[in-house]
Amino acid sequence: MQYAHLGRSGAQVSRLALGTMNFGMVTEEPEAFAIMDAGREAGINFFDTADVYGGPMKPDIEKGFGISEEIVGRWMARGGRRDEVFLATKLYQPTSTSGNA
């Protein structure tokens, strides 16, 4: 695996990121865990997720979002992997229908 410097931090991230957009929507948790395990075995330490990943195809706040982030979080917690992975995320979806989050 090739790595790149992350800014001036001294940290090195894999040039390939493992995307998690389908985790929870198309890819069930056991398969997602296997994909992340395989990614780490291949040297990938840069994972990409977002608060809308793993949610319904059409934005509907009542159906929930962030399922991908939850799956990645459970995978990290299982075996103390947090120190092994750089996690990129972004936010988009409002946190409530009232706007008072």
Residue spans of the language-model regions?
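N-terminal binding-site loop/beta-alpha segment at the start of enzyme catalytic domains
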Residues: 1-86
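Glycine/proline-rich, positively charged
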Residues: 27, 94-101
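Conserved radical SAM core fold
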Residues: 52-55, 92-96
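A short, structured active-site edge motif that brings together acidic residues
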Residues: 83-95
